[in-house]
């Protein structure tokens, strides 16, 4: 009986959040270990389906770096990187687009639909969703000057046309977006999935942006999790070394989304089963929230 009461209390704890977020959009970046582990894939799918059933509109943006690396290796294509960004020539871009849109996207869509959802896969090329220009990577030279390096078909988003997403949401579907955009000449561009999630969230004026990662969240210099960060405090946390390395672009993506009209951004450990539900529907939450 005690366990049953605990379950009832959990449902009651979720009630005000269900009421608050019903009818709202939540953009979720899906990547990392959560895409590789079978139990986590199932819990992700069930979380997303539950959101839709209770009136919340989830929009998914997925990554696919490990799958791209594996396929490039199979084709004998060796990648170069500039400041962590893959140099993407035409041959590499062909593989990237094939893997993201033809393999990973369909797997994510299939898993959600297999468990009772109604997901639809698309890329940034569909409906003119993500318009891009070539991203020139800035590299600091030995003399201290900054050089802009052409890294191929890597895109910087210039415009988001969310019409197709709004249409899918209204029809009861869950959009699943592969991070491939289109240039003015119709050429394909590989885009950082975190960047796509942030830009899409801003375009939709989403209630929340959630980034699923392979870390618990942002930690202070003693290694303790920071459960909440104010937008105004982010520059100082970067300057003093609290936010470092690969966490900087993720936090920057969140801050850009907040300044674009998103209400809250969250960096959450995707290795935790039902991480999405725990963040949205519990008083304590998990991970780090960034507040505008």
Swiss-Prot record:
It is found in: Cytoplasm. GO terms for molecular function: acetylglutamate kinase activity; ATP binding. Its EC number is 2.7.2.8. Pathway: Amino-acid biosynthesis; L-arginine biosynthesis; N(2)-acetyl-L-ornithine from L-glutamate: step 2/4. Substrate binds at residues 64-65, 86, 190. Belongs to the acetylglutamate kinase family. ArgB subfamily. Catalyzes the ATP-dependent phosphorylation of N-acetyl-L-glutamate. This is Acetylglutamate kinase. It comes from Geotalea uraniireducens (strain Rf4) (Geobacter uraniireducens). The lineage of its organism: Bacteria, Pseudomonadati, Thermodesulfobacteriota, Desulfuromonadia, Geobacterales.
């Amino acid at each position: 009986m005690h366990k049953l009461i605990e379950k009832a209390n959990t449902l009651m704890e979720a009630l005000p959040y269900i009421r608050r977020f019903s009818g709202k959009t939540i953009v979720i970046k899906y990547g990392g270990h959560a895409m590789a582990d079978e139990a986590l894939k199932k819990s992700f799918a069930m979380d997303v389906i539950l959101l839709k059933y209770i009136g919340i509109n989830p929009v998914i943006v997925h990554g696919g770096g490990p799958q791209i690396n594996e396929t490039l290796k199979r084709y004998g294509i060796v990648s170069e990187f500039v400041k962590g960004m893959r140099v993407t020539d035409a041959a590499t871009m062909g593989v990237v687009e094939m893997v993201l849109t033809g393999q990973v996207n369909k797997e994510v869509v299939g898993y959600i639909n297999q468990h009772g959802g109604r997901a639809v896969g698309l890329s940034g090329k569909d409906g003119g969703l993500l318009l891009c220009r070539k991203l020139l990577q800035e590299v600091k030279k030995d003399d201290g000057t900054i050089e802009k390096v052409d890294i191929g078909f890597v895109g910087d988003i210039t415009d988001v046309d969310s019409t197709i997403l709004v249409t899918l949401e209204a029809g009861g579907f869950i959009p699943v977006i592969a991070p491939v955009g289109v240039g003015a000449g119709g050429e394909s561009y590989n885009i950082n999935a975190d960047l796509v999630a942030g830009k899409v969230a801003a375009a939709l004026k989403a209630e929340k942006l959630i980034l699923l990662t392979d870390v618990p969240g942002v930690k202070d210099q003693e290694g303790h999790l920071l459960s909440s960060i104010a937008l105004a405090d982010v520059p100082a946390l970067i300057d003093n070394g609290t936010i470092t390395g690969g966490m900087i672009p993720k936090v920057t993506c969140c801050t850009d989304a907040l300044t674009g009209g998103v209400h809250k951004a969250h960096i959450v450990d995707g290795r935790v089963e039902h991480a999405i539900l725990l963040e949205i529907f519990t008083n304590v939450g998990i991970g780090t929230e960034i507040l505008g």
